[in-house]
Amino acid sequence: MKPPRRWMYGRGGGKGKPAGLLLLGVFLCLSVVLLLLLHGSSPSLEGEGRKPEAVEAAGGGGEEEEVAVARAEVEEAPLPPGNARLAFLFIARNRLPLDLVWDAFFRGDKEGRFSIFVHSRPGFVLTRATTRSGFFYNRQVNNSVQVDWGEASMIEAERVLLAHALKDPLNERFVFVSDSCVPLYNFNYTYDYIMSSSTSFVDSFADTKAGRYNPRMDPIIPVENWRKGSQWAVLTRKHAEVVVEDEEVLPEFQKHCRRRPLPEFWRDWDRPIPAEAWKAHNCIPDEHYVQTLLAQHGLEEELTRRSVTHSAWDLSSSKDRERRGWHPVTYKISDATPALVKSIKDIDNIYYETENRKEWCTSNGKPAPCFLFARKFTRAAGLKLLDLSLIAANGASTM
């Protein structure tokens, strides 16, 4: 009796091969068929982690459905292994004059708990020729916009940075940093301070000063949602997504929020300011946008309504032109002293006059300094503070 045909497969010609080789050939063929079947039924790499329902919902819908599916993917996709990160979002003109200060700060992390994104002028690239810190090599975003101070282009730059940083699911907090900003504490203290809170840190208060809110924004942005504050915020991932997905508030800012057409150092003018300039609304977009947007979405209960970045705005007695006009005090090398740093670190509460509100500063439920960062510092001032180990110190002490 002849053996079953399946055991004769591949023998050919009467000079048969060992049965073991035939079995191996059969198993290889079956394996190939099985792999092909599995490949045809599994999601692509681009859609990995997406539920079948979400894939079906993506077809045949409009832009709103696409946004909803994208949001669902972010919520459903499991985090890859690794530590939650702080995404540092630097807004710079060109180079980063304080890159060596930040280099010392980032060296304090040994666990991969940060990422860096830099928005500079279009075409600027961070290389060995343009930065002295390897942490910043090629960290510029590739679709930057030309930013003009006091214009809506500043908030467009913020949105570009957030969009890039949100691509990394490990980024859980988003820290806006200026090119004149220094870290007051070491990395570990800064990380623990920010991550111990489930809220965003957003300087936000009701703006009652006449001339800033433009009634043309109503009814899309009612006056009761109008807020003001520092642009140097720390956002949770949820709030960062709200900013990037906004299609309602941003257009109103682009049309109706513009700074008053005064010269930069108008306080020093020795001639009258044109009357038309005083009649114009004086709205600085980046000092209102995030605050107003989050109020619009009813998210103020999810905020710690203060900034963690210190700026000095007491300009009344200053005779230095660089310290007057629209901008906060710039600290020079002569200002960079232990007394200055101590005075900033000692601040433990902030008072908001328009709301008669005092914000006591805490971290992890305990009293804490209000500020983790400070600006504006020249390069020389920042390096002096670093040499004195007054900032970004990575020793045993966090304070």
Swiss-Prot record:
Write out the GO biological process terms: cellulose biosynthetic process; plant-type cell wall organization
Alphabetically ordered keywords of this record: Cell wall biogenesis/degradation, Cellulose biosynthesis, Glycoprotein, Glycosyltransferase, Membrane, Signal-anchor, Transferase, Transmembrane, Transmembrane helix
Q: Does the entry feature the keyword Transferase, yes or no?
A: yes
Cytoplasmic compartment segments: 1-17
Membrane topology of this protein: Single-pass type II membrane protein
The protein's superkingdom reads Eukaryota
Where can this protein be found?
Membrane
Residue spans crossing the bilayer: 18-38
Q: What happens when the gene is disrupted?
A: Retarded growth and reduced mechanical strength (brittleness) due to reduced cell wall thickness in sclerenchyma and bundle sheath fiber cells.
Q: Which of the residues are on side Lumenal? A: 39-399
Expression by tissue, per the entry, reads: Expressed in roots, culms, leaves and panicles. Expressed in vascular bundles of leaf sheaths and stems where sclerenchyma cells are developing. Expressed in mechanical tissues of young organs, such as young leaf sheaths, stems and tiller buds.
What's the main place this protein lives?
Answer: membrane
Indicate which residues are glycosylated according to the record.
Answer: 142, 188
The family annotation for this protein states: Belongs to the glycosyltransferase 14 family.
What protein name is recorded for this chain? Glycosyltransferase BC10
Give the species this sequence originates from: Oryza sativa subsp. japonica
